[in-house]
Amino acid sequence: SSAASDVYKRHTEDFAYRDEAGISWWQNERLLCFTLSYVSYTGGAHPSTWRQAVSFDLSTGKTVSVTDLATDINQLEEAVYQLILRQIQDSGDTSYFSDYDKTVVDWIERSVFYNANGVTIVFNTYDIAPYSAGEQTFFIPYDLVKPYLNDYGLHLLELDT
């Protein structure tokens, strides 16, 4: 009916819908790490945001996961888990959800990206803190994870020189 289309038109003309995507990257001679960012606003209280990283071995073109880089993945997982917990505790920030440690323990399933100085783990909004706290990022210098890396990991990250 005409009335229905008038209502539809009134409610959609001024609707501020927005989708944005972005890519950033870091690479050395052996590894390429893409970070994909996405923001979507569909009329709610605030936009939804999301970030994901994907890394590639430049010699093979294959994706690289954290498990590919570790001598003992359980030891690496525990070490990084403890380092993230320490950063949270040292920050004094009280906005984290009360059970954030249950999510942080699965950091390996989050967005993990590399640069020349270390590894960054990203927890998207609502993963471990409310939207108002934003995404939570934790940087860990390579010297703290190097003992847990296998030869392949040391090679890709150019820590074998």
Regions found by a protein language model. Give the residues of each.
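A short, polar/proline- and glycine-enriched secondary-structure boundary/capping micro-motif
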Residues: 44-47, 74-80, 131-135
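Short helix-loop boundary/capping segments
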Residues: 51-101
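Contiguous hydrophobic, core-forming segments of folded domains
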Residues: 27-66
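Short, surface-exposed coil-to-beta transition loops
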Residues: 18-20, 47-52, 107
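Short, surface-exposed charged micro-motifs
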Residues: 22-24, 53-55, 109-111
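Active-site acidic/histidine clusters and adjacent loop/turn architecture
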Residues: 1, 5-32, 37-41, 116, ...
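Short N-terminal helix-initiation segments at or just after the protein's N-terminus
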Residues: 1, 5, 53-65, 127-129, ...
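Compositionally biased, intrinsically disordered linkers/stalks adjacent to structured regions
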Residues: 81-138, 142
